[in-house]
Curated annotation (Swiss-Prot):
Description of how the protein assembles with itself and partners: Monomer.
Region (G4) location: 136-139
Disulfide bond annotation, renumbered to this chain: none
Region (G1): 19-26
PROSITE patterns, per database record: G_TR_1 (PS00301), G_TR_2 (PS51722)
Annotated residues for binding of GTP: 19-26, 81-85, 136-139
Residues reported to bind Mg(2+): T26
Function noted in UniProt: GTP hydrolase that promotes the GTP-dependent binding of aminoacyl-tRNA to the A-site of ribosomes during protein biosynthesis.
Keyword Magnesium on entry: yes
Name of protein: Elongation factor Tu
Main location: cytoplasm
A Gene Ontology cellular-component term: cytosol
Length: 396
C-alpha cells in the first residue's frame, strides 16, 4: 500500500496534554481523536493505544511519548501525550516535542495538584507560548459552586506563573463521557469547544524559516583559491549570497560576508531553515572558525558565559551517574555542536543533587557560547550524557 501524501493545506501546530497524574490527560487525548474522527478529521485512538507509549531518545535521554494527529476546520495538530510524570519533565526540558501550546488538564474533583503546578512552571520556564484549560470529570462534582472555585484556583495558579490567568479559556467537560459518545454538553460538545479554544487562543507558530538566520558550525574546510567553507544545518531563517553575517561564540565575534552557498555540490542563491549546506566566507581563514560557533544575522545573538537553567539529571538506570553531585560540580555542557566545561552553582538550600532529580542551577562556562533563553543543552561527563537542560535566564 502506498503511503498517503501529507497535504499541507492548513497551518501546522504542535500541541500536548499536561497536568497531574490521573486527571485524565490520556483519556482526553483519546476523546479528542474519537470525537474528531466522527467528522473524518482524525483516526480514533483507544485509551490503551495511547497509553503504551513507544520510547524515543532525545539528547541521549530515553522518553516515552505518544504522538497522535488530528485536524480541525482551521488547523492540523500534532499532539503529544506522555504516560509518566518523569516523561513530561524530560520531554519539556529536552524539547523532544516542541510545543506551540498545551492543554492543561485538571480534575474538577481534585482541583490543582502538585504536578499541575510543576507542569505550569515548566511550561513557563521552557517557553510554551499559550495554555488552554480543560476541567475534566465535571460529572463527578454535583456542586456548581465547587466547580467555580476550582476554576478560580486554576486561574490564580496560572497568573502566579505569569500566564494570563484571567484570559485563558477554561472548558468544562468529561473526557470519559465524550469517549463513550455522550452528546450532552459535557461530552462531545465540550471536546469541540476545547478544539475551538485551541484554534483561536493558541497563536500560529512562527515558522523557523521566518525567524532570524542562525546556523551552528559543524565543520570547517579551506578550498584553495576560494576560501573557507563552513558546513552545518541551518537552524532558522534564510542566508543569501552577499549577506553580512557574524561568527559568534568561543572567541571574539567576527563579521564577514557570505560569498557562496552550496548544497549537494550545487551552488545556491540561498540556504534556508532545515538545509544542510556549505557557506563560503570572504576573507576568513580556516583557523578563525571552529565547531561550536554559530553563523548569525549581525546583532541578533550574543555570546554568554553565565546562565540559569532548569535541568533533569539522569538516573543510574538511564545510563546516568551512580552518585550524587554537589555545589561546584564541573561537567561539560553540550550546546548545539560542542562541549564546553562549566561550573554549577546549586540553588540556596540545595545541598546535593541525586540522579533522577529535576533542578534549578546557575552555570558559568569557561568559554562564551552563542546563547538565548530556551536554548537546550546536554550535560555530559567524558562524552556520556548525564543530564539535559534548558536555559531559563541569561546572567551575563
Amino acid at each position: 500500500m502506498s503511503k498517503e501524501k501529507f497535504t499541507r493545506n492548513k497551518p501546522h501546530v504542535n500541541i500536548g496534554t499536561i497536568g497531574h497524574v490521573d486527571h485524565g490527560k490520556t483519556t482526553l487525548t483519546a476523546a479528542i481523536t474519537t470525537t474528531l474522527a466522527a467528522s473524518g478529521k482524525a483516526q480514533a485512538m483507544a485509551y490503551d493505544q495511547i497509553d503504551k507509549s513507544p520510547e524515543e531518545k532525545a539528547r541521549g535521554i530515553t522518553i516515552s511519548t505518544t504522538h497522535v494527529e488530528y485536524e480541525t476546520d482551521n488547523r492540523h495538530y500534532a499532539h503529544v501525550d506522555c504516560p509518566g510524570h518523569a516523561d513530561y519533565v524530560k520531554n519539556m526540558i529536552t524539547g523532544a516535542a516542541q510545543m506551540d501550546g498545551a492543554i492543561l488538564v485538571v480534575s474538577s474533583a481534585d482541583g490543582p495538584m502538585p504536578q499541575t503546578r510543576e507542569h505550569i512552571l515548566l511550561a513557563r520556564q521552557v517557553g510554551v507560548p499559550a495554555l488552554v484549560v480543560f476541567m475534566n470529570k465535571v460529572d463527578m462534582v454535583d456542586d456548581k459552586e465547587l466547580l467555580e472555585l476550582v476554576e478560580l484556583e486554576v486561574r490564580e495558579l496560572l497568573s502566579k506563573y505569569e500566564f494570563p490567568g484571567d484570559d485563558i479559556p477554561v472548558v468544562k467537560g468529561s473526557a470519559l463521557k465524550a469517549l463513550e459518545g455522550d452528546t450532552s454538553e459535557i461530552g462531545r460538545p465540550a471536546i469541540m469547544k476545547l478544539m475551538e479554544a485551541c484554534d483561536t487562543y493558541i497563536p500560529a507558530p512562527v515558522r523557523a524559516v521566518d525567524k532570524t538566520f542562525l546556523m551552528p558550525v559543524e565543520d570547517v574546510f579551506s578550498i584553495s583559491g576560494r576560501g573557507t567553507v563552513v558546513t552545518g544545518r541551518v537552524e532558522r531563517g534564510i542566508v543569501k549570497v552577499g549577506d553580512e553575517i557574524e561568527i559568534v561564540g568561543i572567541r571574539p565575534t567576527q563579521k564577514t560576508t557570505v560569498t557562496g552557498i552550496e548544497m549537494f555540490r550545487k551552488l545556491l542563491d540561498e540556504g534556508q531553515a532545515g538545509d544542510n549546506c556549505g557557506v563560503l566566507l570572504r576573507g576568513t581563514k580556516k583557523e578563525d572558525v571552529e565547531r561550536g560557533q554559530v553563523l548569525v544575522k549581525p546583532g541578533t545573538v550574543k555570546p554568554h558565559k553565565k546562565f540559569k537553567a532548569e535541568a533533569y539529571i539522569l538516573t543510574k538506570e538511564e545510563g546516568g551517574r551512580h552518585t550524587p553531585f554537589f555545589n561546584g560540580y564541573r561537567p561539560q555542557f553540550y550546546f548545539r555542536t560542542t562541549d564546553v566545561t562549566g561550573v554549577c552553582t546549586l540553588k540556596a538550600g540545595t545541598e546535593m543533587v541525586m540522579p533522577g532529580d529535576k533542578i534549578e542551577v546557575s552555570v558559568e562556562l569557561i568559554a562564551p557560547i552563542a546563547m538565548e533563553k530556551e536554548l537546550r543543552f546536554a550535560i555530559r561527563e567524558g562524552g556520556r550524557t548525564v543530564g539535559a537542560g534548558v536555559v531559563t535566564e541569561i546572567l551575563e
